[in-house]
Amino acid sequence: MSINPDAPQSNGEQERQIAIWQLKRTIEKLESYTGSGTSVISLLIPPGEQLSSVTGMLTNEYGTASNIKSRVNKNAVLSAITSAMSRLKLYNRLPPNGLAVYCGEIEEDGKNTKVVIDYTPYKPISNFIYLCDSKFHTEHLRELLTNDDTFGFIIMDGKETLMATLSGTVRTILDRSTVDLPKKHGRGGQSSVRFARLREEARHNYVRKVAERANSLFISSGPTGTNKPIVSGLILGGSADFKNVLSTSAIFDQRLQSIVMKQIDINYGGEQGFNQAIEMAGDTLKDVKLIQEVKLLTEFTENIAKDTKRVCFGITDTIRCLEMSAVEKLIVWDDLPYHRVTLQCVINGETSAPVIKYLLKSQMSNPKYLREVINGEEVQLDIMGDQLLLEWFVDNYKNYGASLEFITNRSAEGTQFCSGFGGIGGLLRWQVDLVEAARFMQESDEDSFMDDLEDFI
């Protein structure tokens, strides 16, 4: 596979990966809840539905629920329906991808707590769902997480060329053309040389036309285009050497050359060859996100090995570099367990300045992690707020001029990143001497540290 690791990820793709993480996080949160009785509501509204119709349906359900014999369960169901109706009133119109509403009374830490969550997914909801149960139903949200990357295919032999895309299970033929190339000639002498030259010219023109057509089909151009490939990767298939010549042709756009994932020898051309190429490229297509992840982490570890001073890792150094706006690519494990905890205390009747710590959930209940030396005295701090660090990154990474890259621990490189580097790191815009930065931070307050930034970059 020859995807260029230096090729920047488009903002649209980055936003999509963040939206996928947010959806996974929402699903995990919903699935962790246990309803108090059979009274929690799962409501999924696909685009095209009228909010007034959904509100009318909930009104009817309210009337039906009023006949529930159990007083406790009846009140819980009525309360959940009321919460759902109140949440719908916040929307003047249905969001383009539809709306998911989850509400009801759950059991959490031995207490009953009301939960109301409304969520607009990054992909359209397909079916209308209304369920009242003892748990939140997330099956239909999970369906949205199925791989929807779009891949391009160029199937090319000496008779025809087919260009197509594959997205999930949807196969779309974009273009199909035939060619009549001169056959090898059996004559000798000057005729042989002339026919060989004509044959080579015809093959060259054929490859040129295919390259030009591929450039126009697989790159979003024009006044409203992004000038980027419209596919995540390209598969080149064929029964002769045409695909190899195409992949190195100067006419074949560099932006497409950089995303060629695999070249496949197949027995057929046209649509039959397209189907065979899909089958033979199955493992490559399945692991494309993983391959991109491995390339990113390889770049990360190579910077460490070469001591370029353009890389950071661990929470302390990464946060420090992020606050300096030195981080170009913020790399985080998508299951990073740390929380960003805000702590304060009252000293001599005055509230102290907020202290930020990065703690595991288990550490947040241990007093030894909630102590801090303030004005020369060690004091016990109170938790004023906490947020999953990943959520804080999603909310704030743009403020520091960074891109946000999620990685998993499904590869050897990902496992090493999580266990060896704490699951968090970054590629830097400029060199930073982190040892000098740490020493300087200990000797200076934050303001003077930022003023003298040039001392260690």
Swiss-Prot record:
Its main location: cytoplasm. GO terms for molecular function: translation release factor activity. SMART domains: eRF1_1. Coiled coil: none annotated. InterPro entries: eFR1_2_sf, eRF1_1_Pelota, eRF1_1_sf, eRF1_2, eRF1_3, Peptide_chain-rel_eRF1/aRF1, Ribosomal_eL30-like_sf. The keyword Metal-binding does not apply. It comes from the Eukaryota. Keywords: Cytoplasm, Protein biosynthesis. The keyword Cytoplasm applies. One of its GO terms (cellular component) is cytoplasm. It is found in: Cytoplasm. Transmembrane segments: none annotated. Belongs to the eukaryotic release factor 1 family. Heterodimer of two subunits, one of which binds GTP. Directs the termination of nascent peptide synthesis (translation) in response to the termination codons UAA, UAG and UGA. This is Eukaryotic peptide chain release factor subunit 1. The lineage of its organism: Eukaryota, Metamonada, Diplomonadida, Hexamitidae, Giardiinae. The gene is ERF1.
